[in-house]
Amino acid sequence: MRKIRKKTDKLVDELIALRNSRKSIDDFFSSHQINFYENCRLMHSFVLNDDNKKDLLTIAYRQYYVFLVSCWETFFRDVFIYVHTEDENLTNRLLGKMKPAADTFDESDIALSELLSKSFNFQNIKDLEEAYDDLWGGSFLQSICSKDAGPCGVNGQVADEFVVKNLFDDWHEIVNKTFSIRHKVVHDANYRPDVDIQFIQKAEAIFLLIPQVATHFIAEKFNLKRIAFSKDGQYFPYIFTVSEILSDDWVVVE
């Protein structure tokens, strides 16, 4: 049985800091794209600039894994907190599978949903699946990567079908390998991964697409706002590709 962490001063301070940087439930969908946009453009500026030395590209390549996983972790942690703030029944089901600490239900400056988020490592597929199990009825990532998100807007057009697994049948392996590389980069300054452009292109696409597809289905479930695409008087949920994230011809409007 998974244990709920004790409310130490350090943990409370950390959760309050995370709360202060977290946007509202109506904004966090676009927050992921904006976070991705800033770092994706930086990485690609190294790739496109012929004046950059190879060692600078290698450094940027290593750090890109840290960024990809950071965006992923932030998104799924924030969604977890939002969902468990909105749905008390969902929280009660999760609590039934966990072992509370002595101070779990004591009054404090942090919400129960925030405390529960610290019981899971969102950089680990098994942990993420367990955190979202009650929301989706099990196999959360496998389900959203196999489920059709169409019709939706992609690359300025309406796609009748959009299934992550059909685009990347090895998404699970790519995610796990990216987690592994990120862990080595963060904890071993001597580690130098081989620069594999084909792999990193797959990884950045998957780490951009899966949170957006998750957004699509979670927004449907909780009737939340999402980014939409207008075509012939109809509105469709929109999914950004890497090429669109890198372009300068789009803005988010209300």
Q: What function would you assign to each model-found segment?
A:
Residues 50-60, 64-176:
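Helix-loop junctions and short alpha-helical segments
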Residues 38-56:
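Short amphipathic alpha-helical segments and their helix-coil junctions
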Residues 6-43, 157-162, 166-254:
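Polyanionic, low-complexity intrinsically disordered segments
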